[in-house]
Design a protein with these regions (language model features):
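Cell-envelope/extracellular polymer assembly enzymes that use nucleotide-activated donors
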Residues: 2-5, 23, 33, 176
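A conserved hydrophobic helix/loop-capping motif in glycosyltransferases and polysaccharide synthases
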Residues: 4-16, 20, 27, 37-39
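Acidic donor-binding segment of Leloir-type glycosyltransferases
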Residues: 21-64
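Glycine-rich, basic loop-to-helix element that forms the pyrophosphate-binding segment
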Residues: 63-81
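Conserved donor NDP-sugar-binding/catalytic core segment of glycosyltransferases
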Residues: 98-127
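Conserved nucleotide-sugar donor-binding catalytic segment
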Residues: 137-219
């Protein structure tokens, strides 16, 4: 049974991380290690101990400087990882118990697999899934992944991680990481079952005050990286991916305008409304 290393960046995550950890401890696949990358100086293993969680599969590393960012934190976790496969879980999200066991056969075959991320409210009310219910299992490319607007949390063969996350990016770093994974693997295998709960909180990175401005700054970094050829993307998709990022930038600016007008909730709620209007 392969060892899976789970990467968890944690920044001021005391209120949510225990639930995320318990969702890992509840996995049907038992051979895993969870590497918590503390980016705020907090001792999350001590927090676990204080709450009755004593599990030798939990490990922790701290970033060199507080608030180094999610890319740097996850890269610290990758450097500690001992597993044959890697997976990513944010400290404010949760997995369903079959997440790893369902994706592992697909990742062993193709190298890279994901489930159908479900965006939900903290009370469990569904907002949207990355792909419609009833989507056929199969391979997806980078453009398909990007156009969902919902994060993907894959299980991947370790060698596909390359140099890890782009440390200079503090927003949309997961999109770029996944895009480059797909370029190395050739495609990502989709299991259209919602096994990751992407929990939408007002204070999360994508919804907190200033989030749309941070996204705008990230797009200002990413588009020149695409133009210069610094990112590993399939040549046949370069034009379409550049256009998709430009579209995402326009959508983010529209979200920013709605936020400033006081008419927007979370980004995922805004995105779901935009989809309904488009239909």
């Amino acid at each position: 049974m392969p060892l899976i290393s789970i990467l968890m960046a944690a920044y001021r995550a005391e209120a949510t991380i225990l639930a995320a950890i318990e969702s890992v401890r509840g996995q049907q696949h038992r051979n895993w290690e969870l590497i918590i990358a503390s980016d705020c100086g907090a001792d999350y293993l001590a927090l676990c101990g204080a709450n009755g969680i004593d599990d030798p599969r939990l490990r922790m590393v701290s970033t060199p400087a507080i608030a180094s960012g999610p890319s740097a934190a996850r890269n610290c976790a990758v450097a500690m990882a001992r597993g044959d496969f890697l997976s990513i879980l944010d400290a404010d999200d949760r997995w369903q118990p079959e997440k790893l066991s369902a994706l592992l056969p697909l990742a062993r075959s193709s190298g890279l697999a994901c489930d159908n991320t479900r965006a939900i409210h903290p009370d469990g009310q569904a907002i949207a899934t990355a792909y419609p219910v009833g989507t056929t299992p199969g391979e997806i490319d980078a453009l398909t992944m990007m156009n969902t607007g919902v994060p993907h949390f894959p299980l991947l063969r370790r060698d596909l991680a390359g140099a890890g996350y782009r440390a200079e990016l503090r927003f949309a770093e997961d999109v770029i990481f996944n895009m480059e994974l797909i370029a190395r693997a050739g495609a990502m295998t989709l299991l259209p079952q919602p096994l990751t709960d992407y929990i939408q909180r007002p204070d999360s990175a994508t919804n907190a005050p200033g989030s749309w401005q941070r996204a705008e700054a990230a797009y200002g970094q990413i588009l020149p990286m695409l133009e210069s050829g610094r990112l590993a993307i399939p040549s046949r998709q370069q034009t379409a991916i550049k256009r998709a990022f430009a579209d995402k930038r326009r959508l983010n600016l529209a979200y920013g305008a709605a936020v400033e007008a006081g008419t927007a909730g979370t980004f995922q709620e805004f995105l779901a409304t935009q989809r309904l209007q488009a239909d």
